[in-house]
Regions:
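Terminal targeting signals and extreme-terminal segments of soluble enzymes
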Residues: 1-153
């Protein structure tokens, strides 16, 4: 099992990131997640806590999947006026796990929508752990109804 220094999960959140209030009760329970939105730059991140880890002391794949499923549509909300207020339920989510994210690591991701149609969003992103690529994600999302304000902000 990997052991991080005792203060690893209390390391400061990188400058510019603020707590994410969107996502509903599930993500509030499993987070906290943070967002940085400065101009065209949109990043999401979180610090790997003990409750996020697998028996090897690394980020559990299920938590990575949860993060990716938040990262991609919420990035699209902030980058596209076309769907900024719409609920984007996941149709398909593909994740390639590239490397482990150890306890205490800062996990950060960015995503882009290469294509938006009248009913679907196609998007992709990259996730890093302390700057090292750890996951590649792509997804297809349905353009749903107008979302409650606290679901997308």
């Amino acid at each position: 099992m990997t052991h991080a220094p005792e203060n690893a999960t209390t390391a400061p959140i990188p400058e510019g990131f603020a707590p994410l209030v969107a996502g509903g009760p599930y993500i509030q329970h499993n987070g906290p997640l943070y967002v940085l939105h400065q101009g065209n730059v949109v990043k999401f991140g979180f610090r790997v806590e003990p409750r996020h880890t697998n028996p090897m002391g690394n980020l559990h794949g299920g938590m990575m999947a949860t993060f990716c499923d938040m990262l991609v549509p919420l990035s699209v909300h902030r980058k596209s006026d076309q769907v900024s207020n719409r609920f984007l339920p996941t149709i398909s989510l593909q994740i390639d796990y590239l490397a482990p994210a150890p306890l205490g690591a800062w996990v950060e991701g960015e995503a882009e929508p290469p294509r938006i149609t009248h009913s679907l969003v196609f998007a992709q992103g990259l996730v890093t752990a302390d700057g090292v690529p750890c996951a590649r994600v792509s997804g297809v999302f349905k353009i749903g109804p107008v979302a409650p304000r606290d679901a997308v902000e």
